[in-house]
Swiss-Prot record:
The gene is hbb2. It comes from Gobionotothen gibberifrons (Humped rockcod). This is Hemoglobin subunit beta-2. Involved in oxygen transport from gills to the various peripheral tissues. Gene3D superfamilies: Globins (1.10.490.10). PANTHER family: HEMOGLOBIN FAMILY MEMBER (PTHR11442), HEMOGLOBIN SUBUNIT EPSILON (PTHR11442:SF7). Keywords: Heme, Iron, Metal-binding, Oxygen transport, Transport. InterPro entries: Globin, Globin-like_sf, Globin/Proto, Hemoglobin_b, Hemoglobin_oxygen_transport. PROSITE patterns: GLOBIN. GO terms for biological process: hydrogen peroxide catabolic process. This fish has two hemoglobins: Hb1 (major) and Hb2 (about 15-20% of the total). They display the Root effect and the alkaline Bohr effect, which is enhanced by organophosphate and to a lesser extent by chloride. Residues 2-146 form the Globin domain. Hb 2 is a heterotetramer of two alpha-2 and two beta-2 chains. One of its GO terms (cellular component) is blood microparticle.
Amino acid sequence: VEWTDFERATINDIFSKLEYEVVGPATLARCLVVYPWTQRYFGNFGNLYNAAAIAENPMVSKHGITILHGLDRAVKNMDDIKNTYAELSVLHSEKLHVDPDNFQLLADCLTIVVAARFGNTFTGEVQAAFQKFLSVVVSSLGRQYH
């Protein structure tokens, strides 16, 4: 993947401003509410009965933060995201048996949460860079499935 200077700067800027303790939990909670079938991967998380329970669930919050910190690895290795996520792809494919389509659903939820947090500064150009980055991450996480 070729990255422009603008794309690199944009991705670094977004992640430097993210409030991980807010955005991570909000992203995973949104995914679990909007796409309830994704809840099957989190059976050990306890009460996921409704949107309020999901939003207040400490395990959802913790894992949402973990996911964002996982994206830090891609930010730091933008020129080699596929290899950066090779082990994580194997884990999600062979041990956790996660449907790879769910990575895109989570990426879409992250885009919505980030757009809401950034407001007018999340322009079309910024969104294009962010979604390009997330599409490379999603592809890398799904690599083991191919």
